[in-house]
């Protein structure tokens, strides 16, 4: 036979000697094993071994060692026992005795002894809870590990949804028991049956095949195998689940780092809805990793919940959807890039990665298999970087699709910023669809939550480890510090807050709406969500309305400027959970939350408020579509990955924030998704403010899930200055609140958090302006995809970040005329992000603006294109109503204001669309604008804009549509107090937003509509916003509406000044009353009434909102200095029905703003040139004003000294402010003369600097869209209507959220206001 291969190999003598020795030793060992298995040692065997030892050169010591090995081998002992009976080891034992007995040694004492003992004891306890090994031998684990029959490959987009659909019966009977491995093969698993499909918790045991420790798929963070990596586990309610998991883990193809799916039957019971099963899938470097993780002790009810509903979509990086549970890599797939990107590729069946580490570490992440309807956010949180996925064990993705359960409870927010960790909601979500794929936007609100009973942290698919305690159990997965962790604090992991990537930097979840991981609320609409930015930007605490709705207690956490925030949630199984978020960036700083510190008392009706409409997943990055039921999810993307992550998820609104560090974060806020707990009560807001103060450097996006299925506008907490998670969405889920906190810096590395339910993707984009531009492009794409969601996203629209407002400011800096349209654009951008559904391209632009806002310097390059985008948005939004909200950087109180602002922005957005058209014109005019170096505001020389704005305002006031929403947010840190965003929100456009506002102020709305804004003021001294909001809805009915939101930074001392401000303000508002009247004859009749009505000033913990109804120029406008309260000088057209109530409201707001200002003090660094910013703001205001219903945003940075604020901006005393407001309101007719310019004088900390400067805010004539605005309002309100039902408190909460947003942006300094941007320019 011919030789086909060489007979001699090129082996050296040494190599041959080694191989020979190996063969000899193996042969001898094999012989001893065989003889030992035969039975006891006999004389013949002993002689045979003696000869063999000579032939094979085996020494006596080796002989004895091999014998000892054989004697101690339980396998050989068992065989010998069965073959030759008992007592077959005595001779062998004698033969194997050591010649020299070992000397007894002392127990070594080292530095690690205590730790080792603790681990050993924990292992012993854990093992004691496990069945005896003999009992585990004959499990019925049918592991057809590679059967691909049931589900489509995980990489397949969620749309298929058969297997993955949560809630829906498993695709096939096999599907229910099938785990789909990344390769696409499916493993059939018998799992405990789910008691209820929908909301009943199902108990399931998961056995760990691997060692304890982080659990869940410990997919390689990079998720090399995009498709195959994810394991989708549709689990039927069979008790055999754990066995199947083990078999699956064992049978998984090696291509993934060993992926183990383990179910511990006894160890944890997970409640899942119906058929959804939770499979813990771990792809971890070592296969042993999983088993311990899943331990009996852990409760997985929450996890299961998560699993069924949420499907993990791999983050941007990798297609694989698998959520990595392992500490380092566990969220890697789902969170971080892999999850985000996966969603599109992944089929409905997404791997549910529920990894449970040893009792303490158990994390379960589930991916809801594919409910095609539900929006998939990246099913898993997207980590900014693969490592972020790995970052912390806590970051397991637990996703709850909220698809079927629409109640906020079900919706879990996955904390975006860090790891978007979902607080595992108790049954509601979990019951739903365990397999639901994150990409499923509509039905499911996928959230990933990880619960651990003892030490487990629940991690959403966000990278950053964070700890969420859903129900009793939370699972924690350690994530690499890089990646954001979901809710639970992981050891150095950063929770992904807001943006998954950004969030990765910090753990963001906390009871407050912190949505640490990206997964939370993928599809959530921005409007409802509250996000707060702290100037320090480290942490943003957001209390989503959902949380408020839940009524859960929010524990504000003190956030230290650490990358990672730890969030501890006190799970209330069904009831709202309390989550304490501690943010520790990779640095590992931890913030301890104050348990019970924040309680959300206000229930917000988020359900139905907005839903994210499913948008084709795939093309656009991070496009997440979710229906109302879906929890909001925010996906944060690493700055590089932003676009990649979002492919499967639809993200409606996008926000791009530039971190102080120069990193850009893109926040994509899906409006449609419901963010139930956007805002919390003022008390909560204040608590948040305190928290924010502590974590001034931290920005956390908080999402809270509301038990109610309603969707509320999502508030984002953006911290511009820090690499805080840019976006946060609150998801209505089980009573879980997720807060996302992340640092900007961390963000870029690993902040992709995605809330399963909402399709919100935040992208962390490079901080460069170029990245901003690219981010904007990506956002535009996303927004285009999310345009559908725009209607749904109305409630979210209100969550517009100051950063977005700031973007225009940046543009202003760039170009005199450019800034003006940017100012509108800024508002619009937020709105656009929120109204992405309506105009994808335009909204994309707006999203871009927010990016600009974050970084003043960066925006300059993109400002021009952004402006164009804004113009587009304006055009597109002409039909859509948008309100512009300016958010100040104040961190805590901002929540409500932020919400309101967002709402205002959303309304303004429509106006801005019109005003965008004007804005283009104004762009030219803006060149003529002069920047007041001291005030930092642009003086408008173009009367046309002001006139048009005035006209709009004038016409609007009669309708009471004219509302000056003056939000004074303290930018104490940034000294942006001077920055006031005067937004003459065109209520027409604002109407969509107004629904939210109206929800808050519904009571006031009728009065406002009829006449009694004064009454609203009286009613809502504290919550003037409520009245404003209601007015906005009213205004929505009538096209011309002007909402002016003035965000002023102020200190408590300035509170009185705020009231006085109106009298003293040097603001020259030249609204063209005649024009306005001409624009709206109908509104003229109401003008008188509106004039009578006093601007409503809403006081938040740190937010002061003044709403002016009637025909007021949208220029409210005082930019207050740091110490003094921002004076809200409404245009002359302002109506002053009730000074006292207004004052009271103002005072409250001022107080709140003071709190925020304190918090914002850290933000201060971001804002370099407040005066310029003020100018920019003025320009923005001018732009807004131009539209018939103009939204004027005037941002006066806090450069001015408090004194200045007091003197210039407002009267010496708060009462003056009130009177001033009144006066302005009374003066509407006078204003028309000056209609073109609004003067905002910033008197504040930088009095000397700013006092000379006067800010003229010129309203950009916006084309009145009388019908449009009303219709838009009507259309947008889908979510907003529910908002209208909200109590005023709820509205205030929204406001708080808004404020928080604003504060965040203020932190960035660029973001807060155009004036900032302007200042930067100069």
UniProtKB/Swiss-Prot annotation:
Modified residues (Phosphoserine): 209, 213, 238, 818, 821, 1136
Listed Pfam families: ENT (PF03735)
Comp. bias (Polar residues): 698-707, 1205-1223, 1312-1322
List of residues that carry Phosphothreonine: 207
Gene3D superfamilies tied to this protein: ENT domain
Region of interest (Interaction with BRCA2), ranges: 1-478
Main location: nucleus
Subcellular location: Nucleus
UniProt keyword list: Chromatin regulator, DNA damage, DNA repair, Glycoprotein, Nucleus, Phosphoprotein, Repressor, Transcription, Transcription regulation
One GO term of the biological process aspect: DNA repair
Segments of this protein annotated with the region Interaction with ZMYND11: 104-108
Ranges annotated as biased composition (Acidic residues): 1291-1310
Keyword Zinc: no
GO-annotated molecular function: identical protein binding
GO CC terms: nucleoplasm
Domain ENT: 16-100
Keyword presence, Signal: no
Glycan attachment positions: 228, 236, 271, 501, 506, 557, 1120
Complexes and interactors: Homodimer. Interacts with the transactivation domain of BRCA2. Interacts with CBX1 (via chromoshadow domain). Interacts with ZMYND11. Does not interact with CBX3 or CBX5. Component of a nuclear receptor-mediated transcription complex composed of at least ZNF335, CCAR2 and EMSY; the complex stimulates the transcription of nuclear receptor target genes such as SOX9 and HOXA1. Within the complex interacts with CCAR2 and ZNF335.
PANTHER family referenced in this protein's UniProt entry, alphabetically: BRCA2-INTERACTING TRANSCRIPTIONAL REPRESSOR EMSY (PTHR16500:SF3)
Miscellaneous field: Defects in EMSY may be a cause of sporadic breast cancer and higher-grade ovarian cancers. Overexpressed through amplification almost exclusively in sporadic breast cancer (13%) and higher-grade ovarian cancer (17%). Amplification is associated with worse survival, particularly in node-negative breast cancer, suggesting that it may be of prognostic value.
Purpose: Regulator which is able to repress transcription, possibly via its interaction with a multiprotein chromatin remodeling complex that modifies the chromatin. Its interaction with BRCA2 suggests that it may play a central role in the DNA repair function of BRCA2. Mediates ligand-dependent transcriptional activation by nuclear hormone receptors.
Record's protein name: BRCA2-interacting transcriptional repressor EMSY
Organism for this UniProt entry: Homo sapiens (Human)
Classification of source organism: Eukaryota, Metazoa, Chordata, Craniata, Vertebrata
């Amino acid at each position: 036979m011919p030789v086909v291969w060489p007979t001699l190999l090129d082996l050296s003598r040494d190599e041959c000697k080694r191989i020979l020795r190996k063969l000899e030793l193996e042969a001898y060992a094999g012989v001893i094993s065989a003889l030992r298995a035969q039975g006891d040692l006999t004389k013949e065997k002993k002689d045979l071994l003696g000869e063999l030892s000579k032939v094979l050169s085996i020494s006596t010591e080796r002989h004895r060692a091999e014998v000892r090995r054989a004697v101690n081998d339980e396998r050989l002992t068992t065989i010998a026992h069965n073959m030759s009976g008992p007592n077959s080891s005595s001779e062998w034992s004698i033969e194997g005795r050591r010649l020299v007995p070992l000397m007894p040694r002392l127990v070594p004492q080292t530095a690690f002894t205590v730790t080792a003992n603790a681990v050993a004891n924990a292992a012993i306890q854990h093992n004691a809870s496990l069945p005896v090994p003999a009992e585990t031998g004959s499990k019925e684990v049918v592991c057809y590990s590679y059967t691909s029959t049931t589900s489509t490959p995980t990489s397949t987009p969620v749309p298929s949804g058969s297997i993955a659909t949560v809630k829906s019966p498993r695709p096939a009977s096999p599907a229910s028991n099938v785990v789909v491995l990344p390769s696409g093969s499916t493993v059939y698993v018998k799992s405990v049956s789910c008691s209820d499909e929908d909301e009943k918790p199902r108990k399931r045991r998961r056995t760990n095949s691997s060692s304890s420790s982080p659990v869940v798929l410990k997919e390689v963070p990079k998720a090399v195998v995009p498709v195959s990596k994810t394991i989708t586990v549709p689990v039927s309610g069979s008790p055999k689940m754990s066995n199947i998991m083990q078999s699956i883990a064992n049978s998984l193809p090696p291509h993934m780092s060993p992926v183990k799916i383990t179910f511990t039957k006894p160890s944890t019971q997970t409640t899942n809805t119906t058929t959804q099963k939770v499979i813990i899938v771990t792809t971890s470097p070592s296969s042993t990793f999983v088993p311990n993780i899943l331990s009996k002790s852990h409760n997985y009810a929450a996890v299961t919940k998560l699993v069924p509903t949420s499907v993990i979509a791999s983050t941007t990086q990798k297609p694989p959807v698998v959520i990595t549970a392992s500490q380092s890599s566990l969220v890697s797939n789902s969170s971080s890039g892999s999850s985000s990107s996966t969603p599109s590729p992944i089929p409905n069946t997404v791997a549910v990665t529920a990894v449970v580490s040893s009792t303490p570490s158990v994390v379960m992440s589930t991916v809801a298999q594919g409910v095609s309807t539900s929006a998939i956010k990246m099913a898993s949180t997207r980590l900014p970087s693969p490592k972020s996925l790995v970052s912390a064990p806590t970051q397991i993705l637990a996703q709850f699709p909220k698809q079927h359960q629409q109640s906020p409870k079900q919706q879990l927010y996955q904390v975006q910023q860090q790891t978007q960790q979902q607080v595992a909601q108790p049954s509601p979500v979990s019951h739903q669809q365990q397999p639901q794929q994150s990409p499923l936007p509509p039905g499911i609100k996928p959230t990933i939550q990880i619960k651990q009973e003892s030490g487990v942290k629940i991690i959403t698919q966000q990278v950053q480890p964070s700890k969420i305690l859903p129900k009793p159990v939370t699972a924690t997965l350690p994530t690499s510090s890089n990646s954001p962790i979901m809710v639970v604090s992981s050891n150095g992991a950063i929770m992904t807050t807001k943006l998954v990537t950004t969030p990765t930097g910090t753990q963001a979840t906390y009871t407050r709406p912190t949505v640490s991981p990206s997964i939370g609320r993928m599809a959530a609409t921005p409007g409802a969500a509250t996000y707060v930015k702290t100037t320090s930007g480290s942490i943003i605490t957001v209390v989503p309305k959902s949380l408020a709705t839940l009524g859960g207690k929010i524990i504000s956490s003190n956030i230290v400027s650490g990358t990672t925030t730890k969030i501890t949630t006190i799970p209330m199984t069904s009831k709202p959970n309390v989550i304490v978020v501690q943010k520790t960036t990779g640095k590992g700083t931890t913030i301890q939350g104050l348990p019970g510190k924040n309680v959300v008392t206000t229930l917000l009706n988020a359900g139905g408020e907005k839903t994210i409409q499913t948008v084709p997943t795939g093309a656009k990055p991070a496009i997440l579509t979710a229906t109302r039921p879906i929890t909001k999810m925010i996906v944060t993307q690493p700055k590089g990955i932003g676009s990649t992550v979002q492919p499967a998820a639809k993200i409606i609104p996008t926000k791009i924030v530039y971190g102080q560090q120069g990193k850009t974060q893109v926040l994509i806020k899906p409006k449609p998704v419901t963010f139930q707990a956007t805002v919390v009560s003022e008390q909560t807001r204040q608590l948040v403010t305190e928290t924010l103060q502590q974590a001034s450097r931290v920005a956390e996006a908080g999402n809270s899930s509301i038990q109610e299925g309603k969707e509320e506008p999502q508030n984002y907490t953006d911290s511009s200055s820090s690499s805080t998670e840019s976006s946060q969405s609150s998801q209505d889920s089980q009573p879980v609140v997720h807060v996302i906190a992340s640092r900007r810096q961390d963000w870029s590395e690993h902040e992709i958090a995605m809330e399963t339910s909402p399709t919100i993707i935040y992208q962390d984009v490079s901080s460069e302006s170029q990245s901003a531009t690219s981010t904007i492009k990506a956002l535009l794409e996303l927004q285009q995809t999310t345009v559908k969601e725009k209607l749904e996203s109305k409630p979210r629209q209100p969550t517009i970040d100051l950063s977005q407002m700031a973007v225009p400011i940046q543009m202003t800096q760039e170009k005199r005329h450019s800034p003006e349209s940017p100012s509108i654009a800024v508002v619009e951008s937020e709105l656009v992000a929120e109204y992405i559904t309506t105009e994808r391209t335009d909204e994309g632009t707006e999203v871009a603006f927010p990016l600009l806002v974050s970084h003043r310097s960066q925006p300059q390059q993109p400002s021009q294109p952004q402006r164009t985008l804004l113009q587009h948005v304006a055009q597109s939004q002409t039909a859509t109503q948008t309100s512009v909200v300016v958010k100040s950087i104040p961190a805590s109180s901002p929540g409500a204001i932020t919400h309101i602002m967002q709402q205002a922005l959303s309304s303004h957005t429509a106006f801005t669309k019109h005003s965008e058209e004007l804005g283009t014109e104004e762009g030219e005019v803006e060149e003529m604008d002069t920047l007041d170096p001291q005030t930092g505001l642009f003086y408008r020389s173009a009367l046309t804009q002001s006139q048009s704005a005035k006209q709009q305002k004038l016409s609007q006031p009669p309708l009471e549509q004219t509302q000056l929403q003056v939000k004074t947010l303290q930018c104490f840190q940034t000294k942006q107090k001077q920055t006031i965003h005067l937004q003459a929100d065109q209520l027409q456009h604002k109407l969509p937003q107004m629904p939210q506002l109206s929800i808050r102020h519904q009571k006031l709305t009728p009065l406002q509509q009829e006449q009694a804004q004064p009454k609203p003021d009286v009613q809502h001294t504290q919550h003037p916003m409520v009245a404003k909001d209601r007015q906005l809805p009213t205004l929505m009915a009538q096209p011309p509406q002007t909402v002016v939101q003035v965000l002023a930074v102020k200190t408590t001392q300035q509170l009185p000044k705020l009231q006085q401000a109106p009298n003293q303000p040097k603001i020259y508002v030249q609204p063209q009353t005649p024009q306005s009247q001409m624009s709206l004859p109908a509104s003229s009749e109401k003008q008188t009434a509106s004039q009578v009505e006093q601007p409503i000033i809403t006081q938040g913990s740190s937010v002061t909102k003044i709403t002016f109804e009637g025909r007021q120029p949208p220029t409210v406008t005082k930019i207050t200095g740091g110490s003094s309260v921002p004076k809200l000088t409404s245009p002359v057209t302002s109506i002053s029905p009730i000074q006292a109530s207004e004052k009271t409201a103002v005072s409250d707001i001022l107080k709140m703003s003071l709190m925020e200002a304190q918090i914002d003090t850290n933000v201060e660094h971001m804002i370099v040139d407040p005066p310029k910013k003020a100018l920019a703001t003025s320009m923005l205001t001018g732009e807004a004003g131009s539209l018939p219903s103009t939204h004027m945003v005037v941002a006066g940075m806090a450069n001015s000294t408090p004194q200045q604020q007091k003197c210039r901006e407002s009267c010496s005393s708060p009462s003056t402010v009130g009177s001033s407001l009144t006066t302005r309101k009374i003066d509407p007719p006078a204003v028309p003369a000056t209609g073109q310019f609004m003067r905002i004088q910033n008197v504040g900390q930088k009095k000397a600097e700013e006092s000379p400067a006067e800010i003229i805010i010129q309203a950009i004539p916006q084309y009145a869209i009388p019908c449009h605005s009303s219709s838009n309002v009507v259309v947008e309100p889908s979510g907003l209507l529910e908002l209208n039902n909200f109590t005023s408190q709820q509205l205030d909460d929204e406001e708080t959220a808004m404020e928080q947003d604003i504060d965040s942006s203020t932190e960035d300094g660029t973001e807060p206001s155009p004036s900032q941007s302007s200042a930067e320019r100069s």
